[in-house]
Each structure stands twice: as structure tokens, then as C-alpha cells.
Curated annotation (Swiss-Prot):
Homotetramer. GO terms for biological process: amino acid biosynthetic process; aromatic amino acid family biosynthetic process; chorismate biosynthetic process. Pfam families: Chorismate_synt. It catalyses: 5-O-(1-carboxyvinyl)-3-phosphoshikimate = chorismate + phosphate. FMN binds at R125, S126, S127, N241, A242, G285, K300, P301, T302, S303, S304, R326. This reaction introduces a second double bond into the aromatic ring system. InterPro entries: Chorismate_synth (IPR000453), Chorismate_synth_AroC_sf (IPR035904), Chorismate_synthase_CS (IPR020541). It is an enzyme of class 4 (lyase). NADP(+) binds at R48, R54. One of its GO terms (molecular function) is FMN binding. This is Chorismate synthase. Its cofactor is FMNH2.
Amino acid sequence: MSYNTFGHIFRVTTWGESHGPALGATVDGCPPGVAIEAEAIQHWLDRRKPGQNRFTTQRQEPDAVRILSGTFEGRSTGTPIQLMIENTDQRSKDYGEIARSFRPGHADIAYHWKYGLRDYRGGGRSSARETAARVAAGGVARAALAALVPGLRIEGYMVQIGPHAIDRARFDADEIERNPFWCPDPDTAALWADYLDGLRKAHDSVGAIVEVRASGVPAGLGAPIYGKLDSDLAAAMMTINAVKGVEIGEGMAAACLTGSANADEIRMGPEGPEFLTNHAGGILGGISTGQDVVVRFAVKPTSSILTPRRSVTTDGREVEVVTKGRHDPCVGIRAVPVGEAMMACVLLDHLLLDRGQTGGLRGTIG
């Protein structure tokens, strides 16, 4: 199985399976001299780890990260950084009944068709457990961004679960860390809690939409045509488990706007040009404008549910499948820190690409 690596200069390779002894990431291309501590990476992993509330899987994993290489005296050396996270709470017996049947909505049947075999224990590489490695790599990227672009900030939050979207008029960034949904609207967070409780009792699950916003992004990241920043961001978010759609800025809603409404007008401010709106999501022509970079992605409902679903076995028999084990009623909740990590990795990668191509030179206006 190839294609376990992403990035151009800042390159991340993830490895390991959901029920294997460990998983992790090999990070190559981090500039030397960046302050990197396991405790700082652990902070980001703790936001993603399972079992923290009744709305996520009850699998109890500490997700304790170990840095095996690539640092010396707390700083990156420029060599590959190896990050490892041990699995400690696997229950492979929960998956014995699906060893020869395919779970509807899962990658099981696609993996079987392509490779002729699959790791049925939690889905192996297709499990969302793989995203812990991405969050660890994102911690390295955040550390490098903090050193290279002080003031750059990345924040993710939920904007919709099922049919229930936040009211943006009540958007309060301070609320994001105060509830289990990373929700900036406290009224909607309370509604989501009741809604998910009902779904759990009905042995069902639901999808969600996550928004990730990066502020303080310098203008000039990305390149025309095949090196677009938004192209790489969309690709990065689409690699996250269960993601089925990605939007940049206004996204699909831009199709409903007129040109006069969608085009972000510009005026001269005290420090140069200023945009009056941000329908473009901080990217024009594939290149960052200095505005907030805004990405949204849609996560499908968790496929592992206790409701019986029709399927087939490896020998062609029709069966009903009930997926036992511990699963998220809404996998979108824990996708928030993953989206943040992917944003960090892509922004750092493009920052390094830009420095290599232009040396940081910029055109001037005024």
C-alpha cells in the first residue's frame, strides 16, 4: 500500500493500524532550530484523544507521544522527526463477527477489492485512529509556524451537526473550548447534546460540518494553476477519514451570489490595501491574500452503528451486519483538531515552498 505521505517540502508519512501495537508519523523537512517538546505536541493530541465525553468513542487511549528522532536538546535538527503513539486499549475481539463480512459505508469492501485482504480489526489503516498521527505531525508544523510567522493562529470549530447549524449572529470564539463540540454558539451546543443523546439511544449516528480558520497568514503563499494553496488545502482535508466534501471561503454558496455580491471590494487603508469582505476565504488565484484562510469540510455519519444493515460476506452470501465495538456517534467532533493539524501542515509546506521560489520577495502597492 503506497500513498502514505503528503506534502512537498514539509512531508509527513503516517504509519500504523488501529489495533496494531503503535502508530505514528515521520516528519521530514522541518527547518532546524525549531523548539519542539513532546509536551507541546501532547497538548494538541489531548484535544483529539477518545473517551473524553459521552459524545465520542469510549475507547480509552492516552495517546502519549514519544519523539524518537530529529531533535536535540529540545530543538529540531533538520533530520526526520519520528513520532510514535502506542495503542493501549484495543479490543480486537469486538470485530470477530465482521472478519468475513463487509460493513456498509466502510472501506472494507474497497480494500478487499484492491488488495485481496484487509485488517478488519477496527478498519486497520482506514480507521480514524490514523488521524492521531496527523495531529502529532501538526504539532510539529505549529511549532515551526510559531517560529517563522509569529501571530499566525489556527482554530477549528463545528458549524453543523445533522440538520442543525449554528447561528453565526451568536458566534463567540470564547465558547469553542467550553463545550465538547468545539461549538462557537452555546445555544446550538445545548441543542446538539440533546440531539446526539437521542441518536445514541436509537443506535444511529450523524454527519457534521467543520470549519477551520487561519488568521495572520502572510500574503503570497501558493502558486498559480497546479500549485494553488486552496487546491492543497482541499486535498489535505479530503484525506481525513469520512470527509466527503470541502469548501473554501463562500464555497458552494458562491454559486447563488452575483458577481457584485461575491467579489471582495478593496480600499486603501493606513497600512495598504484592505478587503471589505472575505467571500474568497483568503485565497485568490490560488495565492493567499493576507486575509483569514477559511476552509469547511463535511464529514459523513459514522458507518459503525448497532442498527442492522444489509451486506455480503467474502464468499458472496447476503447477511445483516451489526457493528459492535466503541464508536463515535458523530465522528466530526474529533475531526476538528485533525482539520487544524492539516491546515498547519499545508501552510508550513507552502511557506517553505514560497521561500524557496521567491525568497520572500513581494510586490508593493501605494
